[in-house]
Amino acid sequence: MFVSSPLSLFLTAIALPILLLLLHDGPASLLVEAVAGDDKENQIPLHNFIGELEESIGFYQAIELTNDGDDGNTNSSLLYSKESQYQQIEVHRSKHFGKMLVLDDVVQLTERDADSYNEMMAHIPMFQHPAPQRVLVVGGGDGYVLHEVLKHPSVEHVDHVDLDTDVIQTCEQFFPQWADGWKDSRTKLHIADGAKFAKETPSETYDVIIQDSSDPWTVDEDGVVIPLPSGVLYEKEHICALYRILKPNGILNIQAESFNIPTSLDGIIIWRKLMEDCGFQRSRYGTIHTTSYPTGQIGFLMAEKNPSGSISSKSKDIWKRYQQMIGESGTEDHNKRTTYYHPPLQRGCFDIPLWVHQKIYGQEDTSDLFCQLDVENMDQNNDQDENENENIPVVA
């Protein structure tokens, strides 16, 4: 006779919920009950997951939520729920990732790993520009990208445009650690459509534009691509409007999905072509490791308007500006430190797998696309630049 061991009970508790998740049709909040045997004393507790299915690659991402209600309430992880004019807004509590913002059943950020996406979306374009003073942030209703942008001392003004005021109010309540940007005197918040705002903005207004939008489309169970409200932010008319309102040497950075998902990889190629058609140069795809997003990877497309000079000459300046931002060694401003971004990623994030590089760039000569960030030449112990770099930190 087979006797259930603790290991077999554990495997049942894990495997069965995942199997049930894989049988689910699409992105949704899921409550899954796993039971090992008929004996009530050996019954495995309820497991509460939220997951998203990527049918094109047969991949299901699931995060376990808390279930600490004494009454057995499987919704005890739900801290907040509201249907706004545009979407269903939820805040959940998870076991590993802390509080999570969920829009229309799709995880947007978690307290545990939101730093990776938001720091990269903000600091890569901000440090790429030599002295960004005026910045436009489109989307990013959680406030995290804005929070990071305002760490840069050169910033004089930020226009933050988001469509859904309910998302902003929700994040002010549940994620106050990132909501300080809206109280900063340099920020002007606009509750408006991002495409309409860009269309009505005068030419050559901004040094940097960051578009932190939600997914532009989804794919149903039959493989049909369904446009979502953010899709307008990825159309040629809007991309060209962003080009127009950037100053010369301006930087554009847009959220560009995961290269692991075929429809998203196709989108990266399309959006990059749109950027070039609108006049942008040096458009390139950067990668970010974010555990809570499908396949654990997401990326961005960054491009420049009429770039002048060699971007490789800025590498040492990036280190100096980074040190100025976070404060001198031993006296760092804890509110301005980063936990994911550091200057080597200014170049390193564009190092992508060969097959992805070939898919995005084809036979194109990409030698001019990437900043040659030579970490060795910026090492404070480098004899050649010892005097010049004596105050530049070395990040391990």
Can you annotate each of these PLM segments?
Residues D39-E90, T295-D385, N391-A396:
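SAM/dcSAM-binding transferase cores
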Residues Q255, F280-T291:
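Conserved S-adenosyl-L-methionine
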Residues S29-D38, H190, N389:
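N-terminal, immediately post-signal peptide pro-regions of secreted/luminal proteins
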Residues D39-Q61, S84-Y86, F97, Q108-I254, ...:
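The AdoMet/dcAdoMet-binding core of the Class I SAM-like
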Residues F259, T290, P307-S308:
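Conserved beta-strand elements of beta-rich interaction domains across eukaryotes
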